[in-house]
């Protein structure tokens, strides 16, 4: 049986005060490093008070690590986490590598962290999320309207959390209406060694599902999940799926996750990528990325040395690798 998750297991409120930080994930030698650089500069632009930790797999080349250190990021190497079964079960094969994100629950030198995918950009200060109630995982509800959800009964009946009132849950459905389900590109959490161990143990007895770690985290934290406003994680497809639900002036976080929307790969040729609002958000990302005034500028050589030293010390704390299956390919 799957171990039951309890609120007190993830509650860090009784721990001594520690640091806060943002954290993202990076794997491989591809171009996602550009996303992390853009995110680091975006956090500086909105004057965030907290650093960005980059949890990265061993296959990230030293050249990319140096780029991130030069942008003030704290580099922390982690070992991959592999689920017990093959990647055939996933909506996209590369999703399997995202289970490695579970390692961030072992970053116990931090009291609270905000996870952000590397294809996210912040356009407003979101430090207030650190003040969310302890003992819960906070995130933004997912939209179920894109074709990638077509394997689910939710998609077949047109149900979506953004507009649940539009579809009456059919009585003939064998299951009850779904529990709230968050997008794992952004969430607020509390690192905790007990939670970390429970996550890894639970993974060993949990069958894989199409959305990999996102499904897993929703299952694991289902009883302690609390939704936050969509302004903290605008999934780009909501622009055309639920236009009446979007006020771009108030959006603080944009998630460039639909196919063709990664700013550093953008061509405008994929479906919906020629929309004016999409083009505007792509331009805003590039404006931040290209703004040299947002590059990390240590106040003194000692500040730069401290950033490098912190990355070095953290990287020296190695994780025990898990050997559930052969190594998964790096994220594209």
Curated annotation (Swiss-Prot):
Reaction(s) this enzyme catalyzes, per UniProt: myo-inositol + UDP-alpha-D-galactose = alpha-D-galactosyl-(1->3)-1D-myo-inositol + UDP + H(+)
Keyword check for Electron transport: no
Any one GO biological process: galactose metabolic process
InterPro entries in UniProt: Glyco_trans_8, GNT1/Glycosyltrans_8, Nucleotide-diphossugar_trans
The protein's role, per its UniProt record: Galactinol synthase involved in the biosynthesis of raffinose family oligosaccharides (RFOs) that function as osmoprotectants. May promote plant stress tolerance.
Subcellular location: Cytoplasm
Active site: 101
EC number: 2.4.1.123
Lineage: superkingdom: Eukaryota
Keyword Transferase: yes
Residues reported to bind Mn(2+): 117, 119, 255
Protein family per UniProt: Belongs to the glycosyltransferase 8 family. Galactosyltransferase subfamily.
Keywords of this entry: Carbohydrate metabolism, Cytoplasm, Galactose metabolism, Glycosyltransferase, Manganese, Metal-binding, Transferase
Cofactor requirements of the protein: a divalent metal cation
Name listed for the protein in its UniProt record: Galactinol synthase 7
Primary localisation category: cytoplasm
SUPFAM superfamilies listed in its UniProt record: Nucleotide-diphospho-sugar transferases
An MF annotation (GO) of this entry: inositol 3-alpha-galactosyltransferase activity
PANTHER family the UniProt entry points to: GLYCOGENIN SUBFAMILY MEMBER
GO cellular component: cytoplasm
Enzyme class: transferase
